[in-house]
């Protein structure tokens, strides 16, 4: 791993599955809530500007940030503004759970918040064609993707579903794209016809899907049944996994220490207790912050970040949730 600590930021370039791309820009940045608006029923948007003259780190479509909220809450939100705007970040927040409730009810224009990132495990890859599938607040990372696809001159289509039209954010912004955006509220059209959309996918098309877990599971099932490759998903909640927790050993290659990971305790918890500092955030396998190189052994992947190809490669794992398939792992820690 190379670290560039210029300008107070830590930029990590990790060889392997990211092919030496920027994986994340990590550091605390103080942001001012410059704007707050209602985007839809139960959804508010925040516009954030850096406090001071340093500005905000750059980002690409698919990226998210952490917001440090009250009562020790840290939540991840997809950036949904224009990556070319170096002065502000924009996020959309669905009122669901204590973190988003805090944003809806207590965060006001003029407040200062701590943000971290951005990070991107849902990066928009270059392709001639795209199919975007969005459900509910899952449209937030997709919004900047369709703008990027349009700017690149690629063919694309967006299928966007929600419970009802009044609860679907960004409809006015998306209307400028005409028939390439299909708005399908459930109370008017029923469930999204994922199978129909995926049957039309041609070779070279990348499929990006973000939404509630049942929708993501259905998309994965349809792609498997139809033989559609190129599916990339992002989850806002942990993916259901099956497996029995058993104890195993982890060797920390940088220090030579070996730690016992007991059943019911994560690798992350164990190494933190042993005094090893590891970047982490969600602690449920959805954000990718704790991604760690695997030097030996076979991981039991339980995260919602890695693709099937990346899991099969076995070179990285999310140590907040994933475990070992055998009795021992060697990690670059």
What do the predicted segments below correspond to?
Residues 246-279:
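C-terminal accessory/binding modules appended to enzymatic or scaffolding proteins
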Residues 2-15, 100-254, 260:
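FNR/FR-type flavoprotein reductase catalytic core
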């Amino acid at each position: 791993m190379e670290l560039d600590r210029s300008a107070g930021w830590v930029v990590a370039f990790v060889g392997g599955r990211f092919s030496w791309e920027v994986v994340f820009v990590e550091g605390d940045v103080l942001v001012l809530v410059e704007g707050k608006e209602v985007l839809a029923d139960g959804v508010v948007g925040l516009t954030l500007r850096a406090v001071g003259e340093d500005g905000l780190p750059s980002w690409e479509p698919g990226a998210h940030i952490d917001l440090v909220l009250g009562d020790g809450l840290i939540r991840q939100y997809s950036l949904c503004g224009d990556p070319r705007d170096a002065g502000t970040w924009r996020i959309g927040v669905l009122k669901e759970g204590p973190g988003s409730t805090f944003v809806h009810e207590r965060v006001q224009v003029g407040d200062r918040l701590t943000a971290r990132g951005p990070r991107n495990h849902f990066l928009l890859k270059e392709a001639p064609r795209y199919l975007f599938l969005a459900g509910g607040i899952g449209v937030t990372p997709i919004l900047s993707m369709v703008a990027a696809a349009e700017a690149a001159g690629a063919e694309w289509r967006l299928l966007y579903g929600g419970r009802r039209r009044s609860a679907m954010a960004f409809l006015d912004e998306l209307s400028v794209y005409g028939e390439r955006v299909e708005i399908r509220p459930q109370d008017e059209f029923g469930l999204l016809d994922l199978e129909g959309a995926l049957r039309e996918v041609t070779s070279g098309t990348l499929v990006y899907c973000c939404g509630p877990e049942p929708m993501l599971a259905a998309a994965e099932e349809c792609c498997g049944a139809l033989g559609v490759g190129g599916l990339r998903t992002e989850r806002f909640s942990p993916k259901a996994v099956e497996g029995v927790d058993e104890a195993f050993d982890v060797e920390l290659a940088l220090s030579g220490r070996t730690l016992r990971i007991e059943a019911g305790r994560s690798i992350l918890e164990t190494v933190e207790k042993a005094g090893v500092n590891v970047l982490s955030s969600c602690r449920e396998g959805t954000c990718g912050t704790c991604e760690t190189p695997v030097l030996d052994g076979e991981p039991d992947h339980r995260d919602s970040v890695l693709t099937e190809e990346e899991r099969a490669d076995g070179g990285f794992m999310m140590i907040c949730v994933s475990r070992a398939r055998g009795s021992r792992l060697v990690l670059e820690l």
